[in-house]
């Protein structure tokens, strides 16, 4: 059986920074929704005990990234929590990368989440999604939302999740060919880091906003120009800390019309938001229970 799995992108429909911990982690309130677009991972388990990652060109990746880290963490947890011998837990992982790096679409976090969920099944370690989500915080704060796989209000540093249902819409995702480091953007002093935490029902009724957008627009003139252009036709803002911008539409035809107006030096992709992650859908289609 071919084990090819979705590693979907997300957008932050709103993102507020509500505080900062003594260790540098930021408290947030954000609304995550998944897209029917993203990377794919082909994961082939073996008993050699090694984790190997290959790119689209079948080149072996020699640097440690979120995928390798996730696989190694799962092996370690299985050893310490279950007393399982994990020396034979291995896999070849082939990454088909479509989500741009530094785009705010969550590619690295999504890759780690797909790795954890799929290897948990293939290695039969049988951890719950909640246990995987807690483990994933050792890698990154966005990963629990990808593991749980629902449209979600995210609070705390990413560990507090409130699943909600939201109307699925069409989006034009615009990548300005700029890669933005989340770590670097969080370090900028002028970003508002004390937005008052608000009740969820109030947030959902209010106009959505991203606390990073003003700083990003000042720092990157091209992003500011694209937001201004797209906002003439549809609600538009950055996702995450950028660089991608999304414009929201009620139908695909409207998104296609605005896509045709984009400058030639930017990439545009038309996608649809989904309330259930494509990764979870893939498990349902294979009749595999994620909630053991």
Swiss-Prot record:
Q: Which InterPro entries match?
A: GHMP_kinase_C_dom, GHMP_kinase_C_sf, GHMP_kinase_N_dom, IspE, Ribosomal_Su5_D2-typ_SF, Ribsml_uS5_D2-typ_fold_subgr
Q: Quick check: keyword ATP-binding in the entry?
A: yes
Keywords for this protein:
ATP-binding, Isoprene biosynthesis, Kinase, Nucleotide-binding, Transferase
Q: What EC identifiers does the entry list? A: 2.7.1.148
Annotated pathway, please?
Isoprenoid biosynthesis; isopentenyl diphosphate biosynthesis via DXP pathway; isopentenyl diphosphate from 1-deoxy-D-xylulose 5-phosphate: step 3/6
User: Active site at which residues?
Assistant: 10, 142
What's one Pfam family the UniProt record gives for this protein? GHMP_kinases_C
User: Could you give a single Gene Ontology term from the biological process aspect?
Assistant: terpenoid biosynthetic process
Is Zinc one of the keywords? Answer: no
State the reactions this protein catalyses: 4-CDP-2-C-methyl-D-erythritol + ATP = 4-CDP-2-C-methyl-D-erythritol 2-phosphate + ADP + H(+)
Give GO MF terms, alphabetically: 4-(cytidine 5'-diphospho)-2-C-methyl-D-erythritol kinase activity; ATP binding
Q: PANTHER family in the record, alphabetically?
A: 4-DIPHOSPHOCYTIDYL-2-C-METHYL-D-ERYTHRITOL KINASE, CHLOROPLASTIC (PTHR43527:SF2)
Q: How does it assemble?
A: Homodimer.
Among HAMAP family, the record links this protein to: IspE (MF_00061)
This chain's protein is named 4-diphosphocytidyl-2-C-methyl-D-erythritol kinase
Q: Which gene encodes it?
A: ispE
